[in-house]
Amino acid sequence: MLKRRIIPCLDVKAGRVVKGVAFLNHRDAGDPVELAAAYDAGGADELVFYDITASSDERAIMVDVVERTAAQVFIPLTVGGGLRTVEDMYRMLRAGADKVSINTAAVLNPQLIEDGARRFGSQCIVLSIDARRVNASDEPPRWQVFTHTGRDPRPTGLDAIEWARRGVELGAGEIVINSMDEDGVGGGYDIDLLRAITEAVNVPVIASGGVGSPEHMYAGLVEGRADAVLAASIFHFGAYTIRDVKQYLAERGVPVRL
């Protein structure tokens, strides 16, 4: 049985790791390279860097962060944020990333998924989806895709489930599904959303947004059927270690790399 993955997520702004609530009110969490090395030593299965820097002229900082991180860690590294072209993807992969994650740019130009997959292989292309529940309380669950979530969330009119399916058809090899309603809150993943996505696609799905405890990760992996779980605050600020989480999951029969 495939091992379930525990993946720390590092939001990088102007060369520092930050974490906010619902994409706002950022707290400094440290140096990205130092944190990445600590997570590697602490048993993380992969790492995700999201560049949330507002200005494109600081993008070179992220390339430097990726290069220095890749020189120190030996687990897969995914990089996203501000990647708008195949050349942007190439720059990050050349710097040392194993995978690239695209979100807003893919919605604006779905061909980017196909072009990236054709050049680098589907295994390199991660489609990240920010979704918000939009149904009324007396309606079946429905989630809409939003873009520009770091600064100015914009509704797209796209159904999150349909967008995930289309992304896979275009060549995405993995899906990250992030609940905007739960992001940074610590109340747990949106299991309904997660389950809907995992049942709709045949590629690995990573749960994101809202984890506050090992119990939430267990729910995401077992009830939500995710292949991996992403977390930030609970690791960055010391609430739990990766080994704490893996021990908890292993004791409950979830296959993890110890």
Curated annotation (Swiss-Prot):
Its main location: cytoplasm. Heterodimer of HisH and HisF. This is Imidazole glycerol phosphate synthase subunit HisF. It holds the Pfam family His_biosynth. NCBIfam families: hisF. IGPS catalyzes the conversion of PRFAR and glutamine to IGP, AICAR and glutamate. The HisF subunit catalyzes the cyclization activity that produces IGP and AICAR from PRFAR using the ammonia provided by the HisH subunit. Pathway: Amino-acid biosynthesis; L-histidine biosynthesis; L-histidine from 5-phospho-alpha-D-ribose 1-diphosphate: step 5/9. Keywords: Amino-acid biosynthesis, Cytoplasm, Histidine biosynthesis, Lyase. Signal peptide: none annotated. GO terms for cellular component: cytoplasm. Gene3D superfamilies: Aldolase class I. The keyword Transport does not apply. One of its GO terms (molecular function) is lyase activity. It catalyses: 5-[(5-phospho-1-deoxy-D-ribulos-1-ylimino)methylamino]-1-(5-phospho-beta-D-ribosyl)imidazole-4-carboxamide + L-glutamine = D-erythro-1-(imidazol-4-yl)glycerol 3-phosphate + 5-amino-1-(5-phospho-beta-D-ribosyl)imidazole-4-carboxamide + L-glutamate + H(+).
